[in-house]
Amino acid sequence: MTIPYIVIIAAVISFIMWIVYNKTVLGKNMFAIGGNAQAAVVSGINVGATLIAIYVIAGALYGVGGILEAARTGGATNNYGNMYELDAIAAAVVGGVSITGGVGTVPGIIAGVLIFTVINYGLTFVGMGPYWQLIIKGLIIVIAVAVDVRKYLARK
């Protein structure tokens, strides 16, 4: 049994992003801007340049993801990734990323992706219809956001 190339590429990219987020100035600036952009400006961070770097990195990763998905399926259409954003948001929130910003880790996001992938495959395996799957995913997001807001309010 071999490891799929997509898993290897995802692991390498995750490791690189962990290094960027935890060991570089850009990563610390990203964390600061996510927590409070005004405080980041006051502390001397060039928010504009950092946001441009974030969007460039995100765009490159979206492109890599699209290429890998097209390679996996053998083709692509203009609406192929439709509703993937729901899965991405849900996986991030389940992985511990705060809706209020400034909180989250790369390992937490990976755990959220793995948990949500298991949920997706499990719902498909038991024969649940796609509309019910969307409802369940939405409920998971609502519950995760409610827990996040509760934690946020408890800190205040």
What are these model-derived regions, one by one?
Residues T2-A10, L51, Y55, I109, ...:
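Residue-level signature of transmembrane alpha-helical entry/exit and packing/kink sites
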Residues L26-L51:
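Short cytoplasmic-facing helical segments at TM-TM junctions of multi-pass membrane proteins
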Residues Y55-V56, L61-G63, R72-I135:
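Transmembrane alpha-helical segments in multi-pass inner-membrane proteins
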Residues K23-V25, I99-P107, A154-K156:
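Membrane-helix interface "capping/anchor" motifs
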Residues S14-N22, G66-A70, G95, T124, ...:
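Structural signal for membrane-spanning alpha-helices in multi-pass inner-membrane proteins
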Residues I9, N46-E69:
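Transmembrane alpha-helices
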Residues F15-I16, V42-A49, Y121-K156:
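Cytosolic-side transmembrane-helix boundaries in multi-pass membrane proteins
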Residues M1-F31:
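Alpha-helical transmembrane segments of multi-pass integral membrane proteins
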